[in-house]
Structures are given as C-alpha cells and as structure tokens.
C-alpha cells in the first residue's frame, strides 16, 4: 500500500493518530523503532537542524525537499511535512506540492503567512488575504498527482487578526477542499 493511502486511512480512522515531530533521519529511525504509525516534521526543526537558525524562510524549497526525502528513505511509515507558505505565490505552491510528492511525503501543510514567513511561535507574523490563500489551496489540490496526498491548510490569523478571522478562514479553506485544518 502507498504511504499516501495509508496516511489517509490513518487520518480518516476514528482513533487518535499520534505523530511525533522528528527533525532528522536519526530521530526518524527512533520514531519508527518506537512503533509510531506515521511521523511529521516542521520547518522550525528543519531550520534548527540544518542551519542552527530560527524558522524565518531561510531554507529553500530544494533544501527542504532534500531533507524530507532523506527522512522518507529511512522509514516505512507515512511522513507529513511542513510546506511553509508553499515557498512563494500560487505558482510556487504547485511546484512545492509536486516536489514533496516526488520526495515520498504522504502530505503537507501550507500556511497563510506572508512570504518570507516567521515561525508560528514568533511575534511579528502577518497573513495574506484569505482569497489569496484560497487560490494557493486550489493550486495545491490541482497540482497533486496522487489524490491520497493530504493537503492541510494552516492559519496564523488567530495571532494576527483574532479568533473570528481564523474561524472564517478555516471555513473558506474547508470549502475549497483542504483535507485537514490547523488553527
């Protein structure tokens, strides 16, 4: 079974799915050995591991793809990755999805921050207009070759514009077809 199909089955299951956040191939092997059914990795952990720096869009798409591909090569379970803002505009999002799929990921999340972005835990974040994010999500959904490749929409609007805006955005992102939502 493809890792994408397995991941979709895991998220559709009524059971809670625990995804350890791993940061490199060693932690991926440890997570796999511990019996986790799937794993995830974030931009902050990738930036810290590869550069020793915070997650402020300093890693390129190619660097993230190479990092995630190495992780996917050493585990037999699905891996869900951080797609940041899609590394730019709508055109960039399409390319990001295609490259993440080819690298072996089971899915990714895309966030609605401006590019270059700041880590979600940092102050000074800004979000793009919701309509622009809807266009990015449509591009991401259209770009995926495997219908089981999971696309999660993430918003940082709660910290920027308040909870109501975050909820409004989630409703829009769900309507356009995002598989998962993250506030």
Language-model regions, residue ranges each:
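Alpha/beta enzyme core
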Residues: 2-183
